[in-house]
A protein has these predicted regions:
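Extended ligand-binding regions for polar small-molecule ligands
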Residues: 25, 63-75, 133, 140, ...
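Acidic, polar ligand-binding/catalytic clefts
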Residues: 66, 70, 74, 79-143, ...
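A ligand-binding cleft/hinge motif common to bilobed small-molecule-binding domains
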Residues: 89, 106-114, 160-161, 184-216
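Periplasmic-binding protein-like
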Residues: 46, 122-132, 195, 199-240, ...
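Alpha-to-beta junction loops
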Residues: 41, 77-79, 96-105, 146-148, ...
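Ligand-binding clefts/hinges and TM-proximal coupling segments of bilobed small-molecule sensing domains
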Residues: 23-25, 30, 156-173, 210-211, ...
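Bilobed "Venus flytrap"/periplasmic-binding protein-like clamshell domains
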Residues: 41-49, 58-75, 107, 127-180, ...
Length: 266
């Protein structure tokens, strides 16, 4: 395991070094739009491997958003500053006051009214986590009046499952760990989220399992505050380059994610 992790880190480093010239250097105006404070402040949701996971022993951070944000900062020639949040709701609320410059989040038409987005960089499967011994064995068992579904409030999964589940009862928590706690304590029968989060959290709940199948896909993209058109244009080209160079595939593999695919080129 340690050898595999070292190898993926080495490959990622080579990709980043080898692709140094793939994106044209930004104009001063584009750099200012991306990093008006002189640093690229990248908003990241903790305990979400699509954003960032921190090793409790070493303190090392990994995750698709963390690695891509760090690389974008390197390419535009400014320091990388991760800005960490416990939930996507807190992340988005903080962005309204200008606390960050870019974020890697689920795309939706509602969010596009508040933020500018690049083309998609990830397609992420939704799924369900059930505890050991659960009578819920298939996705078809979930949408019933007696089934309580834990979700992180204001998240993409919250929006998706609220729209698609017609009979189940929702138990909303302020964060993914909070939704897991509802499942652990018996306040919920199943947790709905994106599969990378579910697989990560399942490590904390022995004998739990992620149900087979996928009820839907959560599209993810880079988001920026509105009004920074030159910055969004540069970030959009960075995302396309990262897809074509194999960089996004490499950061997915480094994070060991399941249920995630690189989005098609624009």
């Amino acid at each position: 395991m340690r050898t595999t992790k070292w190898l993926m880190t080495a490959i990622l480093g080579l990709l980043m070094t080898g692709s140094a010239g793939s994106s044209t250097a930004p104009t001063p105006e584009a750099r200012q739009a991306l990093a008006p404070t002189g640093k690229l402040r990248v908003a990241l949701q903790l305990a979400n491997p699509l954003n960032v996971i921190q090793d409790s022993a070493s303190g090392e951070m990994t995750g698709v958003g963390f690695d891509l944000g760090k690389e974008l900062a390197r390419r535009i020639g400014v320091p990388f500053e991760p800005v960490l949040y416990p939930s996507v709701g807190a992340l988005l609320d903080s962005g309204k006051s200008g606390a960050w410059d870019v974020a890697f989040v689920g795309f939706s038409p509602a969010r596009a009214k508040e933020w500018d987005f690049t083309a998609l960089h990830l397609e992420v499967e939704f799924g369900y986590l059930v505890p050991g011994g659960s009578a819920i064995s298939t996705m078809a068992d979930v949408d019933r009046p007696e089934i309580r579904v834990a979700v992180q409030e204001k998240s993409g999964p919250d929006v998706f499952f609220t729209r698609t589940l017609k009979n189940a009862v929702f138990v909303r928590a302020p964060s993914n760990p909070g939704a897991l706690e509802a499942l652990k304590s018996g306040k919920a029968d199943v947790m709905g989220s994106i599969k990378p989060v579910l697989f990560e959290l399942s490590k904390q709940l022995p004998d739990s399992r992620v149900l087979d199948g996928r009820p839907g896909i959560d599209p993810h993209a880079l988001a920026m505050p509105k009004g920074r058109d030159l910055g969004v244009a540069y970030a959009g080209q960075f995302i396309e380059d990262a897809k074509s160079e194999g960089l996004i595939k490499a950061v997915i593999e480094r994070a060991g994610l399941r249920g995630v695919a690189v989005a098609p080129l624009k």
